Amino acid sequence: LVCIKQVPDTSEIKLDPETNNLIRTGLPSIVNPYDMHALEAALAVKDQYEGSRVTVVTMGPPQAEAALRECLSLGADDAALITDRAFGGADTLATSYTIASAIRHIQRTMNREFQIIFCGKQAIDGDTAQVGPQIAEELGMAQATYACELSVDQAAQKAIVKREHENGYEIVEVPLPLLVT
């Protein structure tokens, strides 16, 4: 499963000169670039394991459907849009709780167990890097952040993750199920 977010295209940003706030009107939206990396990683794992499927989930306004359709065109198998006006302005904790609840619902209703949940390291419109780890916590899953390489050992039910950090890299073994950013 891949969590994505539709974000404003930062190459087109304009600020209101009086308030210094982002002018969103007419601003094109894109799939968060870091989430596109997560989708690429999920599709690479799918290619390695026969019978694997990639489901893409996003929380946002109805127009976020366009982001899901883009992911489907790139090879994702299923997509789910979590949308309600009540979610507008949600902080990272509310967002994480809502997405985790949707993941539980998808697992229950589709009788699927997600072994790996992929998230981008952060969204370019917030840069908090909190939603992925908070989803993992809400679901009680192991997590590995700042991953730059991932290999999966299904027989041993673990993943080997190369993580980037300020002093270089480290390689960690993490049990499945796993959330990786």
Model regions: which residues?
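N-terminal glycine-rich FAD/FM-binding segment characteristic of electron-transfer flavoproteins
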Residues: 1-181
